[in-house]
Amino acid sequence: MATKEKQIIDYFDNIGSHFILDGVPIMEVKLPDEVLDEWLNWSKKYRKWKTHNLSFLKDHINKGENTFQISISTNDLENSINLPFTIRLGEYFMHRLHGLSMVRLRKCITLRTHLGHHDNSDYWLNYTNIGDSNPIHVHAGNLSSVIYIDNVEDTPTYFVLEDGREIRYEPKVGYVLIFPSNQEHYVKEKETDKERVTASFNLNFNNTRYDEAKGDSISHEEVIIKK
C-alpha cells in the first residue's frame, strides 16, 4: 500500500473510529477540533437565514421536519478542511467495511452535488427546535451521515436494522456517524427548548471507476454497498 494511503488509514484508526455494533455498518468517528470549529462557525453564519423572511426559498427540503435546513455554499466547502475530511472518511469507511483498496479508491468517493441549483450540494445544516422531528427515512447517494454539532445529547438517533431491531444512539457533540445511504433512521419529536444543531452529507461511490482503477485486485461484486 502507498505511504499516503496508509497515513489516512492510520489517522482514522488513531482517532478511535469504530463500528458501533458488530455486524452493523454504522461507524462512529470523533471530529478533529478544526472540523468541529468549522461546523460551529457555519452554524452561526447560516443561522441568519433561519429567521429571514425569505428563508423558505433557501431551505434544504427533504423528509425532515426540522425548523430550518440549509446547504453549505460551494465557496465555504472549497475553502474548508471539512470537505477533504469527509471524502477521506468515506474512503476509510469503504476500506474498513468492504476491504477495498485505498489506492483504488482515489477519486471514487465524491460529494453528491446539483450543478446550477441554489441548493447545490448534499452537505447541509439542520436547526431543530421543540416540536420538530425527523420521521423514518433513508438518504440519496451511497454513503450518508449525521454530524452532531451543538446541544444534541437530549435527542437520540434511532436506526432500524433489516431484521427489525432498532438501535438507539445517544449522540455526543463533536462526533459523526457514517453509514450506507439506504440505512433507515429517524429522530423522535424534540421535547426540549434549546436549539439542536446537526448536519449531514451524502456521498456517491463510483463503482465503475473503482473497478477500472489500477492497484490491489478485488472483485467487482465486493464493491456493491449493502446494509
Place the predicted regions along the sequence by residue.
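Surface-exposed beta-strand edges and flanking loops
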Residues: 31, 72-74, 127, 161-162, ...
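Non-heme Fe(II)/2-oxoglutarate
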Residues: 2-115, 133, 217, 226
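Catalytic core of non-heme Fe(II) oxygenases with the double-stranded beta-helix
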Residues: 113-189, 194-198, 202-217
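Structured alpha-helical
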Residues: 222-223
